[in-house]
């Protein structure tokens, strides 16, 4: 991959806070939810009744996508978006991985030449300036949004805006962006298809830089300049499947069939629950015991119907009524709910067990403290192994644009579940002498 060296120094015409407010107001108009709805339309079988929602998924489409995933990555991405909104299990899985990185678990290390010593004032200024920028970035919120999209779609493209008002990452439509290289720090760069803005020129005009310069360059030659490099200081790109820069495939696409099956079972259970509370109550008009008489009612039918109508008006929606001269019992439409619940529970466990991680979401299968600690360490490593180094690389590159002599940011390999354990270990290790402390620091990732 070619290294990206270009840098644009243009200042955005809007503050980060203004752009954030504008995006939040207009998100529905520029978001990808319409594409998720389109994926739903493709998965619904139009030949079947829409009242039977548990039978509307056309898995043939999914099988077609899975035969050649690289060629169907846009369809798979749209399907992933739909399942994210449709399946609570899938949403939990995405959020579980996205929240594994604790952006507050970091060390800020001033750069000091041990041989020459350091200028105390410069070191303190570097440390303070770096902390000031980090404190103003609201990393926990902005990066969480990026991580969610990355785990759902494999790649996140964004434009970062930073000034005294704060820091905001504007998501970029992945259908109009693609990874094209990497910086020397290790994080990814991308190019953007500027033809997208022929339908969103108001967005270019309102946001200003870097879009203004990029769109002007595109207009000068719409063929050769269609793909524009996102300027360095604005470029944010995270990718879960870091082993393949070119094809963005949802990390959990192999679970899509199981997730659709689980959604089917949940819909079936909803129908069963409704049927289980449904009852049919009968009002029988008593007959005379005269064996020779026919239709000899002891109550006048007109009077019976008058009271029957009053009775029907007082019934809730899930209870029906009938008036008949034939004796009938109360009819119920129960089902084996326990079996249905077990089916859903087992299907949910199957999704978690085959996800490759997220063992804690199926904690009933974990027995004992040792097993729990092992499971969380595995889940943590799985969720952070690609995104944590990219986060650290991006932060250090971004700081180089904002601080003249930035300190180095080291992201710690921990999660909300293991932070307390790490603090205890660091306190214990701090009591050792300098030689041992240096070795321990190396093991902890410091140098």
Predicted regions and their residues:
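Extended, charged amphipathic alpha-helical segments
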Residues: 5-8, 12-15, 222-368, 402-425
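Short, charge-rich, low-complexity alpha-helical interaction segments
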Residues: 307, 393-400
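A generic structural-conservation signal
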Residues: 143, 361, 438-439
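Intrinsically disordered, low-structural-confidence terminal and linker regions
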Residues: 1-62
